[in-house]
């Protein structure tokens, strides 16, 4: 018996909600909603009494897994490891299939977000690159080529 019904979302905690939201909206995601959450529910689920967070839920075009961005109002966020590379344990990247990888990489560069490495090709099927986005988030961009 499977306990999972579907993959709902991935959550990222960020410091500057507006900057990170703008990046993902410019990439092609849509804002589904924005709200503050606090009280017993958040305290219980997060295990942080007295917490308050602002959340933006983003959705991809069509259907698919959503991206939840959360910025804590209280308590203050705890810094992560901004220079984390792909081999560091934990959540390392958020991945999106794009129509034109080079155009997406060029756009990211004009916004000040460079490649982690380079553009690679996998078995004639995919071209992919990691971009270091706002707040050092690694964003995987992949184009199906075969």
State the predicted function of each range:
Residues 1-21, 27-33, 90-96, 142-146:
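N-terminal beta-strand motif that seeds the catalytic metal site of vicinal oxygen chelate
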Residues 13-64, 103-104, 110, 129-132:
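Core segments of cupin and vicinal oxygen chelate
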Residues 39-44, 77-81, 117-118, 122:
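A cross-kingdom feature marking solvent-exposed beta-strand/loop segments within repeated
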Residues 124-126:
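Short, small/polar residue-rich loop motifs at catalytic or cofactor-binding pockets
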